[in-house]
UniProtKB/Swiss-Prot annotation:
It is found in: Cell membrane. Its main location: membrane. This is Cytochrome bo(3) ubiquinol oxidase subunit 4. Residues 36-45, 97-105 are extracellular. Heterooctamer of two A chains, two B chains, two C chains and two D chains. Cytochrome bo(3) ubiquinol terminal oxidase is the component of the aerobic respiratory chain of E.coli that predominates when cells are grown at high aeration. Has proton pump activity across the membrane in addition to electron transfer, pumping 2 protons/electron. InterPro entries: Cyt_c_oxidase_su4_prok, Cyt_o_ubiqinol_oxidase_su4, Cytochrome_c_oxidase_bac_sub4. The lineage of its organism: Bacteria, Pseudomonadati, Pseudomonadota, Gammaproteobacteria, Enterobacterales. GO terms for molecular function: cytochrome bo3 ubiquinol oxidase activity; proton transmembrane transporter activity. It comes from the Bacteria.
């Protein structure tokens, strides 16, 4: 019984638990703000955006274990490449759809 009370979590488990707590908080905060309407809608949008960006960063740090260590530089370069490709695909598709709509109207 005493080993249960004095258990020692490793560093990875602490990271996952802390990330889960932060992401849970950053998920419930926008829901509460949307339901209770504490602020005007413009302030809520800004808070939602900040919560979303911080949750992305928390997922990268605590769950994907991305850091700025020299050993993990390739992971960051790969992530940057993926973000650029997604940006090109999404905004290229929007641009094509806008031009198609403009040319057909």
């Amino acid at each position: 019984m005493s080993s249960f009370l004095n258990f020692n979590m490793n560093k990875e488990m602490k990271s996952y638990l802390l990330g889960f707590l932060f992401s849970s908080l950053l998920t419930t905060l926008p829901f509460l703000l949307a339901i209770e309407k504490f602020f005007c809608s413009e302030v809520n949008y800004i808070i939602f955006l900040l919560c979303a960006i911080s949750q992305i960063i928390i997922h990268f740090v605590y769950f994907l274990h991305l850091s700025f260590d020299p050993e993990e530089r390739w992971n960051l370069i790969t992530l940057l490449f993926v973000i650029i490709i997604i940006f090109i695909v999404v905004f290229g598709s929007i641009w094509i759809m806008f031009n198609l709509n403009h040319n057909t109207m």
